[in-house]
UniProtKB/Swiss-Prot annotation:
This is Large ribosomal subunit protein uL3. InterPro entries: L3_arc_euk, Ribosomal_L3_dom_3_arc_sf, Ribosomal_uL3, Ribosomal_uL3_arc, Ribosomal_uL3_CS, Transl_B-barrel_sf. It comes from Pyrobaculum islandicum (strain DSM 4184 / JCM 9189 / GEO3). Keywords: Ribonucleoprotein, Ribosomal protein, RNA-binding, rRNA-binding. The keyword Ligase does not apply. One of the primary rRNA binding proteins, it binds directly near the 3'-end of the 23S rRNA, where it nucleates assembly of the 50S subunit. GO terms for biological process: translation. Belongs to the universal ribosomal protein uL3 family. Gene3D superfamilies: 3.30.1430.10, Ribosomal protein L3, domain 3 (4.10.960.10), Translation factors (2.40.30.10).
Amino acid sequence: MSRAMGLKINRPRRGSMGVYPRKRAADIVPRVRTWPEVNLGKPTLLGFAAYKAGMLHAVVVEDRPTSPLYGKEVVKAVTVLDAPPLFIWGFRLYTLDPTNGYKRSIAEVWAPELPAYLRRVLTLPEKVDVDKQMKKVEEFKDVAVDVRALVATQPHLSGIGKKTPELLEIPIGGVPSVDERIKFAVSLLGKTVSPKEVFTAGQLVDVIAVTKGKGYQGVIKRFGVTILPRWHKHRKGHRRTGTIGPQAPAVMFTQPRPGQMGFHQRTEYNKRIIKIGDNGAEITPKSGFLHYGVVKGPYILIQGTVPGARKRLVVLRYPVRPPKKAPPAAEPQVVWISSQSI
């Protein structure tokens, strides 16, 4: 196509092919497919789950030495995550299946005493024989390659008035030894884990959540296709593509078409934790967060935005691709936090 016809030769395609198919997520609870290998010198959970409450703005001292505003106060938008402690109701051992190379569960241990609210999502046994389950762990621990904690959220401690918990698997990492991971998992059985036991303020995390659902949308909003001129030769439409493809093949899946927009699982890498607190009253507006409520207990402040609507479950994970020039690991100096939600 020549320049005389008014088109750029190198115009990129509309919309990314890297996020196909653009359909609704299978579950509102994020499914994490990749976990990093981290060496911290001590065992720890590699992730945490929290509820998105809203956004605020905070005055923070810029601590990046390469920034022209280094040492000065800057205003940053922050997302508030309501982070009640996670309940550890069990753990699993995984080995590699020799036939296909996938991980396969070989042993599972449950906590001896389980809270009643787990009955909403689990069929609880009358009695848990921990000794019998631990014998199976001892039998298979030599071939185990992964240890994962079975955790349940505690939404009744959050501000959303919900009772049914979400169940997740979070790997235990930080040390290469499987024995140390198993001992750590046993020590957590029947206990709760707070966000301060997993992350520290100043570090980077990956944020995984299901985005806001927009329903069925056209190509203008869904792909950013250019609106056609509104004159008589475009009488067949303006908010549409000029062509949906050639005569053959009959359907070009790469062509922008109307369809589902939003409610997709997305991952945003290397978000910085500004602050982790224990008292949600410190950051909750007087009238509560709009469409959420009151943050009662532990909370996490994330710099910038986070996918999803208010009340949505967000999974935080140790970064799988940390930048070569990471920001300072020290806790940022927060001067002031607004009391008015965005």
